[in-house]
């Protein structure tokens, strides 16, 4: 079980890092506009966030043998809460970024699940 969670975490972080790298300028410009300074990630909350996301994916999809659609929807719902909360709180949070986040959440969970299943040959 621990090896599976570690593998899932590695896949999740690598896939997410690739996306963050591709869209970094959009976020840097937006954060600069909203908070008046550049984006600076805090290590402990970042790790906590990934632990929660990966644990959710493992428990609700991998462990319970959910479908790929379930994985997509779980990511969509989790990132949807994040996106809509940001749009509700920050007056300058663009709808475009909210929709990107929402969509990415679904695809991140789907891609991670697909890669995990194919690497481990597990059934879901």
Annotate the PLM regions:
Residues 1-124:
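Juxtamembrane/disordered regions of integral membrane proteins
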